[in-house]
Amino acid sequence: MQLSGFSTNGSGSLNTIVCEKLLFKPNFVQDSFIIGMTILCSVILYGSGNLRYIDALLLASGSCTQTGLQPVDLTQISIYQQLTILLFGVLSTPITVNLGLTLFKLYFYNKRYDMVITNNKLRMTYTYHTVRRRDTPEPSKVGNRKIRVLLDQGNQMHRPVAPETKAEEAEHQENEKHHRHHFRLRKFANAIDRPSFFRGNTMPALPSYAGVRNSQENEDRTEALSPALGKRRMASIDNGSLSVVQNNARNNPVDFYIPSSFEESSFQTIPEDFEPQVHDHENQTQLNHHLDNNSSISSHNPSLETANDGNQETVSSSNSNYSTTRVDNDPHVASYSPQNSNFDHQAAATTNDAHQNVVRGSAITIAPTPVPRHNRRPIYFADDTNGAEQEKGAHRLDGRGRKRGKSFAVTPTLHRNERSMSVLPFQLAKSFTSALPRRLTFNRTHTKASTMSLPYLSYNATVGRNSAFYALTPVEREELAGIEYESLRILTVILVVYFLFWHILGLVAFLIFIYTAKTSGRVVTDGGINRGWWAAFTSSSLFDNLGYSLNSDSLNSFQKAIFPQVLGTILIFLGNTFFPIMLRFIIWIMIRTTRFSPNFQQALYFLFEHPRRSFTLLFPSKTTWVLFLNLTLLNFASFFFFMVLDLGNSYVDKIPVGYRIMNAIFQNAATRSAGFTVVDLSQIAPAVMVTYMFMMYISAYPIAMSIRQTNVYEERSLGIYAADTENDDDNNINNNNNDNNTPKRKNFLMDHIQRQLSHDLWYLFLGYFIITIVEGRRLESEAEPQFTLFAILFEVISGYGTVGLSLGYKNDPSLTAQFRKISKLVMVALQIRGRHRGLPSALDRAVLMPSDKNFDREEEDYMRRHGKKNTNRADPVPSS
């Protein structure tokens, strides 16, 4: 929970000099923010009247630090002052502060990497069109010519072809009447003019092969069914998308089919010297050849092949999954099947029909060559041969040096799983074209729950502890910044929705409760409080852990109201201690349920794998589980002590067992953060008071230790560089040295705890000492038995732990209300100091702005830990 120092590049307004000279401490900005908000809130409260300034200052500090110690009864101030306290408390919560930091970081990323972010937006827009769902409507016409697209028909998916409707059959019969006596070859020549370069020397002529393949003996081997075309040569096109642009309208319908295969008997050979006599020069055939810059054309590139029987021309690729066929006969040719199919009788029937003089409107068939079922995925996974080796230290994202690592490749040129495009109409080609590089190798990351595969980066990056990326070139850092920017955008949306959802849910639930519960509603109205305002104030105070209540006895009046205690417990946990756990759980759910776009999934998974690069309160998996176990044990221990140590207590025994259990659960949740009470703490067992005092002091420890343990720059401030859990290939550390890592890690944690104690104890007891001096006379007086050393120590620890519990004083909500002015000033100082004890000892990577100085720090830390020289490369090395 912090707002640390930040820096930008040298040209920014907040440059490195400002960070090093003015913001020389990591909590400088946080202190300035909280102190400024406290002073501003106190001025507003004091200006509204009915308050002394010292009380206004104490109320403001309690609101901005989420302490909640009340110097006055809130029912004695105006609603405007109550609203001011509530708003300043909401704006100062850890969630809001870190949300503001995320927005601030987004601004600087946008400023420094504007071109990279713009390209990412264009790529996301492009990807949306290329990978859109198949159920979106396709173009219905090219000019005035109808289009019909049938994907994955016939034998490839082992599904029968959908029968034609009555309207389609009537249309086919009408076409047969008009075109029955026309010549097939003349009709073929008039339909679509072939590109000029097919007949010229603009592209090298390659031998053509059979146009249609089928699987007969082996699924992995295919053979040609039609004879070669002699001198008619077709150009080889590698990994391209060919789009046919037809500029004029035609009256003949155009149908697009994807047949599985064709029988050999249905093909005839076009004469070698055949040349169409009628050409429509308005029809242009354009080839859009999309090739990657850094990829080379293989000599084994797929070729375009043609085969004709006088009625059809087939353009296919030997390695491609698609072929384009000109069809002038019955459309049922799309349903032809190989010999081992269940539809052999359909193939025989259609073969006989092909020799008849039944001619219908011209049609274009886009036919994929048969591919075995186990080879149909466009991306194949290859197990890493070295993935089983347990390496130590910084790992590489190419799957070669990672434990449980695998890699998958997208290879649009040479592999059997490619999806290269053949000649397509313009409206279809723009949906299928792809801007992927010729070969991309990505990392396949495994988690304990399941295996998910998403691309990270297009280069091999060295990653150390706490997601620190080392030895990156400027170009590679820009690519990394683009992914980080997208992850920050997603995180911002998650935080806003999370924050608003629980506020609205709490408000609606408490409104329903307070207007339907007769006893509880009467308690609120008897205190002169509006029910609707009570619901809004209480729900927000619970989720934001303010600890303020409009009732003078906190929530003691609702001791037997189950619903507000259950909902209040949930809001307290999710608004503070369990927030990091819930945030990671939400991201985990989104990864498995959302399917927006590949870029969205990539950024979301990057946020899941490298949380501490983006957000202070988002931790890796292991740290999150440790935090969950610690919080569970602490809450169970507090609940156990309340139930056991209060046995025989006259005050607690009066509470029925069922309500007592619910009171123990709620009080346990409020003791470590919120500061609400449902029982009178001054009447419970002394041992339970000591337990609560201990819980208030260590309230910040679980999250603070998680932050510091996962901070990249923490080791720099401590001078202790913990070894990586997994070292890279260059470290050459054997497995025997792994035993030495455990003591180092224990020393690392123990050093944190010792520094935290030295940070807390002297300040805490100094404040306690000053208050005992100021309140000495009252401590000695027998007329005020509630003024005791233990009560003051309880109040001091409650203020320093920003909890807000108090043993009370007669009719006042807290003992602080009876302190003198100097003692109240000490309490303000304790609250502000305690608000920052969750800060790390050094700048946090999650709040640092991108700058060359911060990049140099990462390289320096890498060299200190591994004893390596700077390995920055001049140019990025594309993976292959």
Curated annotation (Swiss-Prot):
Keywords: Cell membrane, Glycoprotein, Ion transport, Membrane, Potassium, Potassium transport, Transmembrane, Transmembrane helix, Transport. Residues 289-315 have a biased composition (Polar residues). It is found in: Cell membrane. It comes from Schizosaccharomyces pombe (strain 972 / ATCC 24843). Residues 316-325 have a biased composition (Low complexity). GO terms for biological process: cellular response to cation stress; intracellular potassium ion homeostasis; potassium ion import across plasma membrane; regulation of membrane potential. This is Potassium transport protein 2. Glycans are attached at N9, N239, N283, N293, N294, N321, N443, N460. The gene is trk2. Together with TRK1, defines the major, high-affinity potassium influx transport system. Involved in maintenance of the proper sodium/potassium ratio in the cell and in regulating the plasma membrane potential. Belongs to the TrkH potassium transport family. Residues 157-182, 289-344, 857-880 are annotated as: Disordered.
